[in-house]
């Protein structure tokens, strides 16, 4: 998946979360599924959850860049793959950025 400048990402309203020192856990209450998150995924999820109006791909890249040591190329590839996986699982929704 390539970064889409006109897309915003939102956490699904059916997902509940809790955080630990080294990650977190998501519960999709509609599907009855539980998912564990590492520290990076937990930071991404927390940012999605705290910004109900939605976040852009660049917002997520900046959150991780400011909190973890990682190369930009690797960072963008990993975040894109993570968002794609979350979208397939129905945990996030992608929509067009409001004009």
Give each language-model segment a name.
Residues 1-42:
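Acidic, low-complexity/disordered tracts enriched in E/D and polar residues
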Residues 33-99:
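Long, charge-rich, low-complexity alpha-helical segments
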